[in-house]
Amino acid sequence: MEAASAQRSTSDSRHEDARYPRLSVASWLAAATPFTRSFQGAGLGFYPEWMLDLRGIDVEEIATALEDQTDYEHRWLIDPRTGQVALWTSDTGLDGKNPVEIDELDLILIDPLPSYVWYQDMADFADGISDSATGRRLTQSVQGRGAFRRFKNQVYEHHPELISAWHALRDVRAQRRAVEWLLDQGLIDDGAAQQFATDHPDPGLP
């Protein structure tokens, strides 16, 4: 789980060399194999009826994108043909050099989930801690504005013994949400999503 945390906090520089074929949907369909089905529009979206293999998708990177609440000067996207994730910026496009309008890309936007989704993880963690005094302090820390900052301070500064447990809960839930998002977009099948959820339950809390 520590490796997962490091993966999710990797800097934007890892995406600077990402390049995706600038292929229109019409051109792609014209070159499609017999196994390719028609696309159905939704959002940016053109979603293939055939599914991606979840094992080839960077679930942790999608989780990072879903949690990214920063701004709209950069956006995360996924290629529905390959499952590869890319970072687009308004100044440097996808390749870090050439600006391109995001609407011109045959990629699917990964919009961040609302902050209350991630807030619930903190609340559940505080509620699940066995030591009642520690649990109360954590619960108090997530009340009102500044909850994320106060909770982080409580865990990292005052209860470092809980850091690994917090990372474990936070990361596994983030990964499950990433898989649920892929399912909602029609990129993976229900069986794969259900199996992932079964294989990645919430960890026990101290």
Range-by-range predicted roles:
Residues 45, 55-144:
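The feature represents the first ordered module of a protein
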Residues 118-183:
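Amphipathic protein-protein interaction modules
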Residues 166-206:
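Acidic, proline/glycine-rich low-complexity IDRs
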Residues 8:
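Cationic, low-complexity basic patches in intrinsically disordered or flexible, solvent-exposed regions
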Residues 20, 35, 39, 46-47:
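Aromatic (phenylalanine/tyrosine) cluster motif
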Residues 16-18, 25, 36:
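Short hydrophobic alpha-helical segments enriched in small aliphatic residues
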